[in-house]
Regions:
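Acidic, surface-exposed loops and disordered segments
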Residues: 1-189
Length: 189
């Protein structure tokens, strides 16, 4: 996976079409998680659960922005064993899975939640692992092109036609923290 290209192409979608993601793509995602997905702390036990749209009613009362759940054909739940670095590890892993979905031309949206036990109860999950991250995924609705005023500085202003409401990405180097994450991916300065 070319991380630089995937980071530039990644966007968050808040309206999904009803179109299901093919089982082959979900299989590729599962295989990527099991064999390739980097972990910051490999000794933390994790599990990836892929849910379909039938899980939406259960998630509506326990996840989403102020209990407002983004409707999607599928949801990813990343479960993690309790650990002082569980949240960091899960965020790192899930963002890598989001980039893999981007590579497969599948749109995503991170979901907020505050109570792992409430989600586990709503979904009837009996695992000892805790919910660490949730992402909705599928194919985003087509959006009309909109004019966007792009102000880079006081002297660099342009107007662009944009087909999405995403914001330009800052250079990858600004956001990427050199250290454990870089070395686990085999990157050097």
């Amino acid at each position: 996976m070319n991380y630089s290209v995937m980071i530039q192409n990644r966007r968050s979608v808040h309206a999904f079409r009803e179109k299901e993601v093919p089982s082959e793509a979900i299989g590729q995602l599962r295989s990527y998680y099991e064999k390739t997905c980097p972990r910051l702390v490999p000794e933390i036990a994790t599990e990836l659960i892929v849910l379909d749209k039938d899980a939406q009613p259960a998630l509506e009362s326990s996840a989403g922005y102020n209990q407002f759940l983004i409707g999607a054909p599928h949801y990813l739940l990343l479960m993690s064993a309790p650990h002082s670095y569980a949240a960091i590890n899960a965020g790192y892993m899930m963002e890598d899975l989001v980039l893999k979905l981007t590579e497969l031309d599948i749109d995503t949206c991170w979901m907020t939640f505050t109570d792992s036990d409430k989600i586990k109860k709503a979904l009837s999950l009996t695992t000892p692992l805790e919910v660490a991250a949730i992402v909705a995924f599928g194919y985003g609705e087509k959006t009309a092109k909109k004019l966007r005023l792009n102000i880079l500085s006081m002297s660099q202003i342009d107007v662009r036609a944009s087909s999405s409401t995403t914001r330009p990405k800052r250079a990858c180097m600004i956001w990427f923290t050199w250290g454990v994450g870089a070395t686990s991916l085999g990157l050097t300065r």
